Amino acid sequence: MLENSKISLSPGATIGILGGGQLGRMSALAAARLGFRCHIFTPENNSPASHVAFKTTIANYEDQDALRSFANESDVITYEFENIPIETALFLEQLKPVYPSPSILAISQHRGSEKKFATDHGIRVTPYELVTNYTELERAIIKLKTPSILKTCRFGYDGKGQEKLSDLNSAKKAWEKLATQDAILEQFVEFEKEISVIIARNN
């Protein structure tokens, strides 16, 4: 693993971004305003980020030759979203500094791990229960009450991979629809708005 803590970028440096979606596009536009170039790595043709990036590599995340070339042309590497294979991040970490680290990426890929990480660091989260089968879901509903939200632990984004439960009757259908994997049940929280924040820091 490369030592990441001492890296410093100056305008003109190239930031490698894994993923070519809307978040990659917004990151590339913001980086350009600061004088940085972005190299997008994505398996998708005609991705949103590719239209504004300095360079785009179109290849599978498992293509090590393409990943190596991508790393050689980047000064630092990051991701536009969390569903990047861990193996890809670990491979690239041997070649260039990768932020956030693959260990943090792994946490962000599982909602249960995210909740535990937050609570372990003193951050309050919505009351929740991990569930791996329908019996556990029924117990969780009795504990947390309804309305509640059933969410897949992995591959959920932009409202996908989740169902609002109004009672036990709706729980059965939701479980059959979503639970091909572990899930979490969250107590429903009334809210006025949702805020997304990207945080960066220097050394």
Regions found by a protein language model. Name each.
Residues 1-109, 113, 135:
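ATP-binding N-terminal substructure of ATP-dependent carboxylate-amine bond-forming enzymes
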Residues 107-196, 200-203:
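Active-site nucleotide/adenylate-binding loops and adjacent lid/helix of ATP-dependent enzymes
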